[in-house]
A protein has these predicted regions:
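Active-site phosphate-binding and catalytic loops of NTP-dependent enzymes
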Residues: 3-4, 25-28, 51-54, 94-98, ...
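Canonical AAA+ ATPase core
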Residues: 48-53, 69-82, 88-165, 173-174
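Conserved RecA-like P-loop NTPase ATPase core
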Residues: 3, 12, 41, 73, ...
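Short glycine-rich substrate-engagement loop in P-loop NTPases that contacts/grips substrate
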Residues: 33-65
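Walker A/P-loop
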Residues: 2-34
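Conserved C-terminal "switch" segment of AAA+ ATPases
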Residues: 134-209, 238-239
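C-terminal engagement/docking regions of AAA+ P-loop ATPases
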Residues: 203-223, 231-296
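Short loop/turn elements that form and flank the Walker-type P-loop nucleotide-binding site
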Residues: 9, 23-24, 64-66, 103-106
Length: 296
């Protein structure tokens, strides 16, 4: 998940609360800077192992490779060495520690920044890995704002252990999600969105002075989107992805903030078209059934 917003809007609190969902969960937080090193994220190199065993290995306990939920602030300031290691962790859930590949227990990675990644800096691959992008701002509702400023700072909240998700439950859910079906109307929505994206980019190419950048969605991203839709359906107790789940794509398809309104309209239009088509199809089936009854 990538959170885009100014400082002081409780972005890091999301990660700290999220870890409570998992039994025995731990969180790792870090504020990136241009001078951040891999040691600060993945753990320092063990001098003893390097000296006595001639082995390059990090002491990872308490750092990203051992955390359940990770929060990285100012993510785009990470250097190339950190970026490359993060790509492997996100893609494969594996951290290469010296000559060993270690499976990480990470269930969620939340990154934040008050800006989007600069173009031409080699950050495109890392940005593409963050499936959900969300704008985060200050509290707008005045009653909520008043309650926030007048309430004493709370200690770390607690969750009943019986409600927390165990590693075994999480593994089982991951397997069960794979069996969630895709209704043909959901595939129609995805096809429609792909067509709309092509039209959007084509219009930009033909514009005399394009004011926006092309909206590219990789095949890998589409596959992850479908996985998200399946997760949404599963957690609602459904055996099939529904059109309402498709609304999540509003937060998955934009790359620039200037594209958010277009993406929202495109998703709502595609879902609406599919709903109308589905209803008309049912109406046609009902007419055929009535005609068949008369013949019988």
């Amino acid at each position: 998940i990538f959170l885009l917003g100014p400082p002081g809007v409780a972005k890091s609190m999301v990660a700290r609360r999220l870890k409570l969902m998992f039994r025995g969960g731990t969180a790792f937080e870090y504020l990136m800077s241009r001078f951040s090193t891999p040691d600060e994220i993945f753990g320092p190199v063990s001098i003893a192992r390097l000296k006595n065993e001639d082995t390059y290995e990090r002491m990872t306990e308490g750092y990203l490779p051992t955390a359940t939920v990770v929060f990285l602030d100012e993510i785009w300031k990470a250097g190339p060495a950190i970026q490359n290691a993060l790509l492997t962790v996100i893609n494969e859930k594996i951290f290469r520690n010296g000559q060993f590949s270690v499976r990480v227990p990470m269930k969620g990675l939340i990154a934040a920044s008050n800006e989007l990644p600069a173009s031409g800096q080699g950050l495109e691959a890392l940005y593409d890995r963050f499936l959900v992008r969300k704008l985060v701002g200050g509290i707008e509702d005045l009653s909520d704002f008043d309650r926030m400023i007048s309430t004493a700072d709370e200690s770390e909240p607690e969750m009943d252990e019986h409600l927390a998700v165990s590693d075994e439950e999480y593994r089982q859910w991951q397997e069960q999600m794979k069996s969630v079906g895709l209704h043909y109307s959901v595939l129609e929505v995805i096809h429609s969105l792909k067509d709309k994206l092509e039209d959007y980019n084509r219009q930009l190419e033909n514009a005399d002075s394009p004011s926006d950048v092309a909206l590219y969605v990789s095949d890998r991203r589409w596959k992850k989107i479908v996985r998200l839709l399946r997760a949404s359906a599963f957690l609602q107790g459904n055996t099939e992805v529904r059109l309402s789940d498709c609304l999540l794509m509003v937060h998955c398809l934009w790359n620039e903030t200037s594209q958010i309104d277009w993406v929202r309209d495109a998703v709502l239009t595609a879902v609406g078209e599919s709903v109308r088509g589905y209803v008309l199809n049912l109406s046609g089936i009902e007419t055929d059934l009535q005609a068949l009854k008369k013949e019988l």
